[in-house]
Amino acid sequence: MPPMTKAEGKQDKKAQQYGVTPQSVDFNDWYNEVVKKADLADNSPVAGAMVVKPYGTALWENIQRWLDDRFKATGHESLIFPTLIPMNFITKEADHVEGFAPELFTVDRIGTEQLTEPYVLRPTSETIIGYMWSGWLNSYRDLPFLHYQWGSVFRAELRTKAFLRTSEFYWHEGHTAHASEEEARREVRQILDLYHEFCRDILALPVVRGEKTASERFAGAVATYSIEGMMRDGKALQSGTSHYLGQNFSKAFDVKFQTREQREEYAYTTSWAISSRIIGAIIMTHGDDFGLIMPPRIAPIQVVVIPVSRKENFDQMVAEGEKLAHELRAQGLRVKVDRREGVTNGFKYNDWELKGVPVRIELGPRDLEQGVVVVKNRNAEEKETLPREEAIRGMANRLDSIHNWLLQRATDFLLTHTVPADSYEELKNAIEHGNWVRAFHCGNAECEAQIKEDTKATTRNIPLDDAEFFNEREEGVCVKCGQPSAYGKRVIFGRQY
């Protein structure tokens, strides 16, 4: 991973007191410990599957709520499809079955009775949705279909990592059908831009919007677009995808309609998704050596109030803490009062730091007498003593400032650790030092595969012309073979999760 800054390095010794391995010592251990000790998730007795605990579930529910509201606001409708999909559906689209075959969970018996037609646990739902659409669609008047569902999907993973790679994971999957290619492609971009907005404005995650190379496309897609985020170890995380499927699935499942001109035509379809992997992105983009730092706009708890007192007046201080919390909740904030007894204040401070709650307020008897509170931002070293009313009045702005700080820090890291390369040696050296690389590429799949074999890096995407980062158009020759660039701009290479 890229070297830590001097300021971050100074935290290592102090961080050990919290029981979290510093990122600079072992990023993988740091991640696993934070997931467990921050009470986000735990291992389960089912190989490759996790249990998402209440704190992690609350985070996922906030993610669902924001996205669900936006989907509905843009005319999309939710529905529910079966988890079991007939195996013969998967085999109908050749590229689709080839892409998913190694990952399928198969159900071939009920009790001791062998099934004549096996099922699979859904890896994604394009096939069964296409089958149902074929019975629902008759005329252009029925279009567009703007559908999505929330649920879990199943893809066998040998090397699992909580939230990032599990054999069962959680997501929404959107599926739409349109009367024209233009309309379908517009849908693909609308969703990609919505994902970008969500990451930037809600999660404080800077992401690169771009199109995947042919080798990295979704199985059966004509074009795949992604948002790519850089984690604190320099690896990429594909944080969301939007696919233009053309007529591939509609032809496989006979999804056709009568046009205005009374012709029969196959529908143009799309699919798109953000999964629970986005929680991994939050952890690995914003976390530090003391644990999580929750983006304030999505945090399950935005402010924690800690009554500070001796045992004899603890109940009184808890009551005062609840009054303070009530005033903050009146602003629409998510607030918790730590009512735990028999636990030291120091333990509580460390615990909420680990959980990444954006703002901590300490309230003791002397503070109460003086009409002040002690406030500490999760991203700050020092505490502030403020008049009670001032702290309450300024809380929304304080949370916004933390969001902006997180976004700027992550953006600076992305820009610092993304470098151009004009020779193969430069590319290999930059990748080895934990960077993303911007380089020209010929578009040849064999050339791309050789780069992956040599460096363990893949093409992340080809940034769009209106992408926030790295969108410059320029010509050059492939960094590997010297042939002319296929894309008129540099492609992003990086190791990935």
UniProtKB/Swiss-Prot annotation:
Protein name per its UniProtKB record: Proline--tRNA ligase
UniProt catalytic activity: tRNA(Pro) + L-proline + ATP = L-prolyl-tRNA(Pro) + AMP + diphosphate
Domain comment in the entry: Consists of three domains: the N-terminal catalytic domain, the anticodon-binding domain and the C-terminal extension.
Subunit structure: Homodimer.
Gene Ontology biological-process annotations: prolyl-tRNA aminoacylation
This protein's UniProt keywords: Aminoacyl-tRNA synthetase, ATP-binding, Cytoplasm, Ligase, Nucleotide-binding, Protein biosynthesis
Family (UniProt): Belongs to the class-II aminoacyl-tRNA synthetase family. ProS type 3 subfamily.
Localization (cell): Cytoplasm
Described function: Catalyzes the attachment of proline to tRNA(Pro) in a two-step reaction: proline is first activated by ATP to form Pro-AMP and then transferred to the acceptor end of tRNA(Pro).
Originating organism: Deinococcus geothermalis (strain DSM 11300 / CIP 105573 / AG-3a)
A Pfam family matched in the record: ProRS-C_1
Matching InterPro entries: aa-tRNA-synt_IIb, aa-tRNA-synth_II, aa-tRNA-synth_II/BPL/LPL, Anticodon-bd, Anticodon-bd_dom_sf, Pro-tRNA-ligase_IIa, Pro-tRNA-ligase_IIa_arc-type, Pro-tRNA_ligase_II_C
EC identifiers of the protein: 6.1.1.15
Gene Ontology cellular component annotations, sorted alphabetically: aminoacyl-tRNA synthetase multienzyme complex; cytoplasm
Keyword hit for Cytoplasm: yes
Any one GO molecular-function label of the UniProt entry: ATP binding
Residues of the signal peptide: none
